[in-house]
């Protein structure tokens, strides 16, 4: 098939420099939001910047624009993505909000998009805008300048994230500061991109080591985190903690003693068995 992470001139060889790490459907039309580390998508090598929207059959979703040729200044019809937006660095996760906007989370410093007014058929020109770790875009890729305006972002490294109720986003990793506030490897942003003070108060001192994975069960409204920590909010925790979506600890969840290593992934099933 087609996709990112494949050398289209040598389909049998996987290009490990490219990858996908998020795959999400838009509820209204089932088009697919894809993100990771890639600069082209599909057999037609559609130029993208780590994020794209594909058809519900995961084919390229593009529009045709006439661009001048550097060779003779004639116009050539070129394909560009309908989602004309993206990031300089690969997002860790991307999400679709309840009103079908796109939120990208990661160790991101710049938003970018193709400038069709300055581009040529042979080479696309990108415009860049500074962002701070988390950004929001429209379905066609325009940057939402009102979202997280003048935010500082993360000091450290974001490793994972999940979307919870009301378009909130919980971000985890190895970091000591987020938007100028001292934190311990976990934060929650509300729908407008500011820190959720209730959640931050409830998690207290957070984790005393890296949080590497996070998963959310929307039916049970529970968050599971795993990582290289032995305490969470000052209470012993053997690399796994379950939280309620307000940041309070689920006191019923007790993991058995582990020896010889740490958990690196956990998720909560919908059944109660």
Model-identified regions with their sequence ranges:
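Extracytoplasmic mature domains of secreted or surface-exposed proteins
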Residues: 1-273
């Amino acid at each position: 098939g087609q996709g990112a992470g494949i050398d289209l001139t040598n389909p049998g060889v996987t290009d490990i420099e490219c990858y996908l790490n998020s795959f999400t459907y838009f509820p209204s039309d089932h088009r697919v939001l894809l993100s990771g580390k890639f600069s082209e998508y599909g057999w037609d090598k559609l130029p993208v910047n780590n994020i794209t929207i594909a058809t519900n059959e995961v084919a390229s979703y593009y529009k045709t624009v006439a661009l001048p040729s550097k060779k003779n200044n004639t116009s050539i019809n070129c394909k560009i993505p309908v989602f004309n937006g993206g990031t300089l660095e690969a997002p860790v996760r991307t999400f679709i909000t309840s009103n079908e906007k796109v939120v990208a989370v990661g160790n991101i410093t710049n938003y970018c998009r193709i400038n069709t007014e300055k581009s040529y058929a042979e080479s696309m020109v990108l415009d860049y805008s500074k962002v701070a770790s988390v950004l929001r875009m429209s379905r066609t890729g325009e940057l939402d300048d009102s979202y997280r305006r003048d935010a500082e972002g993360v000091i450290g490294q974001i490793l994972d994230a999940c979307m919870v109720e009301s378009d909130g986003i919980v971000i985890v990793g190895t970091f000591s500061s987020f938007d100028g506030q001292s934190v311990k490897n976990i934060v929650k942003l509300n729908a407008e991109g500011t820190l959720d003070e209730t959640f931050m108060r409830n998690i207290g001192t957070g984790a005393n080591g890296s949080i590497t994975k996070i998963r959310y069960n929307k039916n049970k409204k529970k968050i599971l985190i795993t990582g290289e920590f032995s305490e969470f909010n000052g209470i012993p925790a053997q690399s796994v903690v379950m939280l309620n979506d307000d940041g309070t600890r689920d006191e019923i969840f007790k993991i058995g003693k582990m020896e010889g290593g740490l958990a690196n992934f956990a998720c909560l099933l919908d059944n109660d068995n």
